[in-house]
Swiss-Prot record:
Disulfide bonds join 37-61, 42-63, 57-78. This is Complement inhibitor RaCI3. Complement inhibitor. Prevents complement-mediated C5 activation by binding to C5. Binds C5 at a different binding site than the other tick complement inhibitors OmCI and CirpT1, and the drug eculizumab. Inhibits complement in human and guinea pig but not in other species tested (rabbit, rat, mouse, and pig). Keywords: Complement system impairing toxin, Disulfide bond, Secreted, Signal, Toxin. It comes from Dermacentor andersoni (Rocky mountain wood tick). Residues 1-24 form the signal peptide. Belongs to the RaCI family. The keyword Ribosomal protein does not apply. One of its GO terms (cellular component) is extracellular region. Expressed in salivary glands. Its main location: secreted. GO terms for molecular function: toxin activity. It is found in: Secreted.
């Protein structure tokens, strides 16, 4: 009976180590931004008409500002927007289908 308890304890220890290794490797990977939006700073400020404007991000990027909405002068970070393409297919009988791909 003691040998069976030892075997169960050994199996639990091995499975706990395996699960711990799986979770710790996932936490250490960072999100890497690549492309035109990488390391681009954007700005929110008031223009000459007193309206809030956001500038600094290239086309296809979104400016994310981590300040409250009541703060007019703030800096943010540009992130790439998810892009999708549409594929249009025409069959021999003349029907057309469109599919969006991400």
């Amino acid at each position: 009976m003691a040998a069976l308890n030892g075997l169960v304890l050994l199996l639990l220890t091995i499975s706990a180590m395996f699960i711990s290794e799986c979770y710790s490797s996932g936490e250490s990977q960072s999100i890497q931004r690549k492309g035109q939006c990488e390391e681009v700073i954007c700005h929110r400020k008031l223009n000459h008409l007193g309206e809030r404007v956001t500038s600094g991000c290239p086309t296809g990027c979104l400016c994310v500002i981590r300040e409250p909405d009541n703060v007019d002068n703030a800096n943010g970070t540009c992130y790439a927007l998810m892009s999708s393409t549409t594929t249009t297919t025409t069959t021999p009988d003349g029907t057309t289908t469109s599919e969006e791909e991400e």
